[in-house]
C-alpha cells in the first residue's frame, strides 16, 4: 500500500519534485529523483498507474499482437489441425487477455513507487503558479501540492482529422479501439504508420477484412525500400487491402456502419464501400 502522505500544512503538501504523468518518461524521472534523495510525488489522471504506454499504447498493442500470433501459429500447426476443428477467436476474447496483461503491469509499477517512497496522486492536475499544482481527484476533492521542481510528462493522444465523427460508436482512434465490444466483419484503418500497420496485422490475423488507407505513396517511407516492400508484401499476402495515395474527405455515418468518402491524389472523390 502507498505510504501515508505527509501533510506539511493544513492546506497543502510540499515536495522537492512533482512529476505529471506516470508513463515511461514520468516514471523514469520520478525514480531518478527519488534515488537522488528527493521527496517526490507523481500525479496521473488515471486511477491506475502506467500512463498511455501501459493502458492504450505499447503494452496492450504488443499483448494483442502476441496473442494473435499465437492463434495464427495454432491454426497453422498440422498437429492441432488433426485433433480439433478450426476455432475463430473474436476481438473481445483477445482483448480480455490484453486487459489481463495491463493489470499485471499496473501492479508492477505500483510496487516500484511503493519501494521508492514516491507518493501517488490520482486526478487532473492544474498548474497554479511556478511552485504550485492543484489536483482534483476522481471524487472532486481538491489537493494542493507545493514543489521546487516540476516534470511534465503527460504523454500524447491520437490525431483526429477534422471532418471525421469520432463520437460515432463505429469510429475509433488507436486509444479507443481497446474498448471494442462488438463483432465486426470489416475494418478500415486510416493511417498507415507503425500503429496502423500493427493493427492491420492484428485484425487480419483474426480473419477480419482489412483496408489500410495510406496517404503516402508507400508504407513507412522512412524505412529502407527493402524493408518497406517486405512489409507491404506480407500484409498483402495475409489479405490486407492497402490503398496508397488516398485521403478520407468525410464519413457517411449509419447506425451500424460508416462509409468513408475518399479521394486519391489523381481522382475526384469516390465512394468506398
Positions of the model-derived regions?
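Single conserved hydrophobic/aromatic residue that forms the stacking wall/gate
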Residues: 272
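Hydrophobic anchor at the start of a short beta-strand
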Residues: 39-40, 210
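Rossmann-like NAD(P)H-binding beta-loop-alpha module
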Residues: 181-218, 222-223
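Conserved phosphate-binding and hydrolysis motifs of nucleotide-dependent enzymes
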Residues: 21-26, 155, 191-196
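A broad helix-preferring feature
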Residues: 15-16, 196
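Glycine-rich flavin
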Residues: 2-15, 24-25, 32-38, 44-183, ...
Amino acid at each position: 500500500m502507498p505510504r501515508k502522505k505527509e501533510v506539511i500544512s493544513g492546506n497543502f503538501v510540499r515536495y522537492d519534485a512533482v512529476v505529471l504523468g506516470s508513463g515511461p518518461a514520468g516514471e523514469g524521472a520520478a525514480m531518478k529523483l527519488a534515488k537522488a534523495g528527493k521527496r517526490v510525488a507523481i500525479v496521473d489522471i488515471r486511477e491506475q498507474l502506467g500512463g498511455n504506454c501501459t493502458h492504450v499504447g505499447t503494452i496492450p498493442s504488443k499483448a494483442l499482437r502476441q496473442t494473435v500470433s499465437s492463434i495464427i501459429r495454432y491454426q497453422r500447426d498440422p498437429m492441432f489441425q488433426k485433433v480439433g476443428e478450426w476455432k475463430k477467436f473474436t476481438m473481445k476474447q483477445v482483448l480480455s487477455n490484453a486487459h489481463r496483461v495491463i493489470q499485471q503491469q499496473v501492479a508492477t509499477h505500483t510496487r516500484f513507487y511503493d519501494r521508492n517512497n514516491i507518493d501517488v496522486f490520482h486526478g487532473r492536475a492544474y498548474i497554479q503558479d511556478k511552485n504550485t499544482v492543484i489536483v482534483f481527484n476522481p471524487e472532486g476533492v481538491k489537493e494542493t501540492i507545493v514543489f521546487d521542481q516540476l516534470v511534465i510528462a503527460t504523454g500524447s493522444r491520437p490525431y483526429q482529422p477534422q471532418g471525421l465523427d469520432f463520437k460515432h460508436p463505429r469510429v475509433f482512434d488507436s486509444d479507443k479501439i481497446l474498448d471494442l465490444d462488438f463483432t465486426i466483419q470489416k475494418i478500415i484503418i486510416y493511417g498507415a504508420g507503425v500503429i496502423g500497420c500493427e493493427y492491420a496485422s492484428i485484425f487480419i490475423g483474426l480473419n477480419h477484412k482489412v483496408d489500410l488507407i495510406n496517404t503516402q505513396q508507400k508504407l513507412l517511407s522512412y524505412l529502407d525500400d527493402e524493408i518497406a516492400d517486405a512489409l507491404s508484401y506480407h500484409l498483402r499476402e495475409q489479405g490486407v487491402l492497402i490503398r496508397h495515395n488516398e485521403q478520407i474527405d468525410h464519413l457517411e455515418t449509419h447506425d451500424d456502419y460508416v462509409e468513408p468518402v475518399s479521394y486519391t491524389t489523381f481522382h475526384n472523390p469516390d465512394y468506398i464501400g
